[in-house]
């Protein structure tokens, strides 16, 4: 006799199937983000930790990426505090906002900062600012060297201040045609212009390494002076008096080779510690005396100025008895 089970059905056994994965990342709600209030006129922006509070009108006034974000084309989410998060450096975002608000901004002087601002302008698609940054960078690249500025000495005090304020060697040209008491020789005007032209050429070539000064108020007619570490090292005077048969004349020379030599010699004073004594000796410097004479007169030799004068023509009757003509001391 078979017995048939009766009663309520047995409880269903637990399912052995694994739960199906949803395949979706956690939604914005999981991070506490919510849509931007559609009717709001103001927006709070958190750009890489830099906080900004601005209006929708500013953000949507120009055709940029920010206009695409806040004109309703895409959904913009905010955090619990109502801040819109933008994962970007906020260093130049204030400049971006100012450009969107005003249409122009002062650009940074640094080439590096200009490049950074250009990168941000490209990211936010601010076309006008992109063009301004590119133009500024191009102008900086075209400026190959700094301006060649030549101070004009107006007083001995100003000259001393200029010499004390620079660490560069100094080349000074004094030219003052009004100092002449006599007529000039036929070649003097031409030679004076040659001295001025050579000074300008040297200034254009060496203005990055030397300070060039012009003096138009001094007592000489044409004289070059060379300074190193605040003191005069050499001097080349280009004028002399020619005694003709019946009248005196002023003669201006153009000792081009000597001027070039002294200009190159003064370059050894570029280093703060001064020139090497062996180098001074090789170039005929003031400290370049022989080893036997490097005793008690060493300091005097180091501070002696090389003065080179052009030949001075003197008649026999006007030369005092026993006077010798000295061309270099």
UniProtKB/Swiss-Prot annotation:
Expressed in a wide variety of tissues. Residues 1-31, 282-303 are annotated as: Disordered. Keywords: Autism, Autism spectrum disorder, Disease variant, Nucleus, Schizophrenia, Ubl conjugation pathway. The keyword Nucleus applies. It holds the Pfam family BTB_2. CDD domains: BTB_POZ_KCTD13_BACURD1. Its main location: nucleus. SMART domains: BTB. One of its GO terms (cellular component) is Cul3-RING ubiquitin ligase complex. Pathway: Protein modification; protein ubiquitination. Residues 1-22 have a biased composition (Low complexity). It is found in: Nucleus. PROSITE patterns: BTB. InterPro entries: BACURD1-3 (IPR045068), BTB/POZ_dom (IPR000210), SKP1/BTB/POZ_sf (IPR011333), T1-type_BTB (IPR003131). PANTHER family: BTB/POZ DOMAIN-CONTAINING ADAPTER FOR CUL3-MEDIATED RHOA DEGRADATION PROTEIN FAMILY MEMBER, BTB_POZ DOMAIN-CONTAINING ADAPTER FOR CUL3-MEDIATED RHOA DEGRADATION PROTEIN 1. Homotetramer; forms a two-fold symmetric tetramer in solution. Interacts with CUL3; interaction is direct and forms a 5:5 heterodecamer. Component of the BCR(KCTD13) E3 ubiquitin ligase complex, at least composed of CUL3, KCTD13/BACURD1 and RBX1. Interacts with RHOA; with a preference for RhoA-GDP. Interacts with POLD2 and PCNA. Interacts with SPRTN. Substrate-specific adapter of a BCR (BTB-CUL3-RBX1) E3 ubiquitin-protein ligase complex required for synaptic transmission. The BCR(KCTD13) E3 ubiquitin ligase complex mediates the ubiquitination of RHOA, leading to its degradation by the proteasome Degradation of RHOA regulates the actin cytoskeleton and promotes synaptic transmission. This is BTB/POZ domain-containing adapter for CUL3-mediated RhoA degradation protein 1. It comes from Homo sapiens (Human).
């Amino acid at each position: 006799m078979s017995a048939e089970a009766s009663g309520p059905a047995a409880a269903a056994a637990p399912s052995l199937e694994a739960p199906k994965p949803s395949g979706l990342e956690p939604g914005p709600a999981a991070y506490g983000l919510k849509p931007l209030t559609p009717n709001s006129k103001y927006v709070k922006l958190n750009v890489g930790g830099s906080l900004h509070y601005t209006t929708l009108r500013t953000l949507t006034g120009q055709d940029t990426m920010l206009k695409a974000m806040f004109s309703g084309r895409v959904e913009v989410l905010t955090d619990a505090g109502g801040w819109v998060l933008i994962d970007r450096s906020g260093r130049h975002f204030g400049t971006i906002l100012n450009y969107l608000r005003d249409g122009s901004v002062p650009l940074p002087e640094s080439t590096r900062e200009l490049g950074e601002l250009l990168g941000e302008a490209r990211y936010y698609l601010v076309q006008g600012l992109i063009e301004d940054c590119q133009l500024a960078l191009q102008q900086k690249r075209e400026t190959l060297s700094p301006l060649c500025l030549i101070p004009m000495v107006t007083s001995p005090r100003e000259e001393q201040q200029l010499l004390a304020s620079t660490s560069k060697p100094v080349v000074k040209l004094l030219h003052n045609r009004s100092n002449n008491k006599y007529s000039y020789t036929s070649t003097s005007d031409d030679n004076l212009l040659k001295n001025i032209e050579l000074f300008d050429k040297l200034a254009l070539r060496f203005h990055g390494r030397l300070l060039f000064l012009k003096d138009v108020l001094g007592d000489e007619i044409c004289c070059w002076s060379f300074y190193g570490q605040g003191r005069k090292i050499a001097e080349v005077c280009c004028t002399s008096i020619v005694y003709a048969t019946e009248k005196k004349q002023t003669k201006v020379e153009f000792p081009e080779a000597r001027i070039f030599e002294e200009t190159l010699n003064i370059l050894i004073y570029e280093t703060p510690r001064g020139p090497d004594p062996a180098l001074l000796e090789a170039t005929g410097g003031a400290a370049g005396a022989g080893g036997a004479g490097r005793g008690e007169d060493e300091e005097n030799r180091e501070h002696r100025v090389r003065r080179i004068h052009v030949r001075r023509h003197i008649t026999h009757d006007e030369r005092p008895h026993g006077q010798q003509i000295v061309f270099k001391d």
